[in-house]
């Protein structure tokens, strides 16, 4: 195997710290043609679908990829903007904000980039760019507050896979979750309070998280527990009683049982229980995307109103809100503690290297 090196390395170049923010992914366009390879990459990941590969290959290529891309493209067209995918646009804004904060706090020593686990910009491509920019230390922050094997775990797999190809490995720190970090909890609570100041409160606050098959929980994935802890801490920050909020799970597909209660079924039954006004927030999503804008903001709104509800409000994700960007910056600063204590003088390093016979 030929390992990737840095043939243009210069001793006079000051080493830099890389910060990689990642999210799930997005197709390149809201078209059937673009959705097919994106969904194929996403759904073929064994972290996402834990089914024996031969069986799943037949289902994926024989059924799903011949039907789902068209439906997904129609949904993506509803949320696409002038900047393209909302998830990618928000990631770009988050990267810009974190980069500005780190530079302001610690100087121009950082290479901050964003990447997607599926689609583009791909993790491997972005890491190559970062190594070319001279990073020798790397912090990876998957933008999933709650750890899940299909999300955070898969991100680690992809980063690790890329690093196995490299001759010079960086010092590496990987943030696996921040579901109970007070700065993140505070940012979510502030966002909800701001919504209440403008619109008042509803009968119930629904905290909807992306779902996953129930057997992942029984086999040891901590995602379900971390979601409930996040909800509890948000409720405490807002001073809510347990009866004033509900934790639910959305976006299930297939016939297997997923984490419950399901968001759509909960919204469908609440009016019969006398709950006619709800506000929905998605604390497991760091940025608005198809699952929040279309599924929660549109589809589930219709479900609730058609079931007899009278008021439905979706509270947007944190996206690039300043409090959120500050929380992300602080998480990263915690991880680089110690990396900034011993700055190298590139001039001295270059001189010493030349004395040992390094190329001029």
Please place each PLM-identified region on the residue numbering.
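Active-site-proximal alpha-helix that buttresses catalytic centers in soluble enzyme cores
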Residues: 1-360
